[in-house]
Amino acid sequence: MGSKYPRSLRCCLPLWALELQTAFSLLFCFFIPHDTAQVDHRFMASYQVLRNLTLMAALGFGFLSSSFRRHSWSSVAFNLFMLALGVQGTILLDHFLGQVLQWNKINNLSSIQIATMSTLPVLISAGAVLGKVNLVQLTVMVLMEAMAFGAIRFADEKVFKMTEHIIMMHGHVFGAYFGLTVAWWLSRSLPRRVGENAQTEKVQMATSSSLFAMLGTLFLWIFWPAINSALLEGTKKRNAVFNTYYALAVSAVTATSMSALSHPQGKINMVHIHNAVLAGGVAVGAPGCLISSPWISMVLGLIAGLISIWGAKCPRACLNHMLQNSSGIHYTFGLPGLLGALTYYCLQIVTEPKSSDLWIITQTVTHIGALSFAVAMGMVTGLLTGCLLSVRVWRAPHAAKYFDDQTFWEFPHLAVGF
């Protein structure tokens, strides 16, 4: 008997997605004007930054999630769908918040750039649930997470007085814990043995898919300095670019060597390479602009690589079922992001020449408060989103259909009745 799930998706997805896109188009028509500023060298520089960010988001994160043997098509295509939807929603959210809160923000190429960076937490968190939800559920998740991260950006800017650069770096941590919380809640509704048996065979890696995932890793590795320096200028931008490359280089070497060391026969695990080589770039994202000597960023890359390998290898058996961390976002983005945020705080305290006790206390409260707020928002809104996605109206796939492209895609060479 054929599966009834594709029929429910046929009824639900076009109606929901097209209505949402029509609403977005009408809102853009009446409220979002084109930028009329003259095109100059600054426009082209902004476009180059936007191009690099889009390559990272579309190709890097898309292929990074394609390592599952029977879920590679969905990982790449759903990632692009979420990126396109998230950028539109974030631009509208920023515009209306600017109108209500009287922010002096112009809708130009920089707006698309910031919207793209604000959508990266969505792509990070999606790594924890891809293969377990359908496209309608992902649409709801994009909207919920975009609004939650918009609230974080507002609170960090107005309450904690954080710069836009640091706010975006907190997005790595927010996205990681948001996705982990959503995945944890969705897993609660499944019988333990049923969920494990359904996922064991499909989570296994295949050589071809691993190569595509490695391609995504390479895109992210090459272009990661773009995200760490996109919102900076002058000396800070230069420092961020240099230090990101140093940290990425060290984390790549650390990931390869430690992966071999952790195997009884000295063999390298491709999963470790997919994730751990990026940990240095995540860790140096916040403090990179303050680091004036390369050895500090290299040490950060080393520590981040060690943390990532440790997270992938040592506690995996006891934590994986609890955190639902099959994609590794916890030890690729979550833990290195926390390391980077704490390092930024320490460097700011050390590099300030005339720091008083009151200033140190103020900085401690604001930085720890902003970071804690991002983590708490990720968990709370992730829990709410998980509750919402578990409602039966979304026609979620059965556990037997997890990590299976045949649930969503047409395969002409297969039997028609699937």
Curated annotation (Swiss-Prot):
Disulfide bonds: none annotated. This is Blood group Rh(D) polypeptide. The keyword Disulfide bond does not apply. May be part of an oligomeric complex which is likely to have a transport or channel function in the erythrocyte membrane. Palmitoylated. The keyword Nucleotide-binding does not apply. Keywords: Cell membrane, Lipoprotein, Membrane, Palmitate, Transmembrane, Transmembrane helix. Its main location: membrane. GO terms for molecular function: ammonium channel activity. It comes from the Eukaryota. One of its GO terms (biological process) is erythrocyte development. It is a multi-pass membrane protein. It is found in: Cell membrane. GO terms for cellular component: membrane; plasma membrane. Belongs to the ammonium transporter (TC 2.A.49) family. Rh subfamily. It comes from Mus musculus. The chain crosses the membrane at residues 12-32, 43-63, 73-93, 112-131, 133-155, 166-186, 211-231, 241-261, 268-288, 290-310, 331-351, 368-388. Pfam families: Ammonium_transp (PF00909).
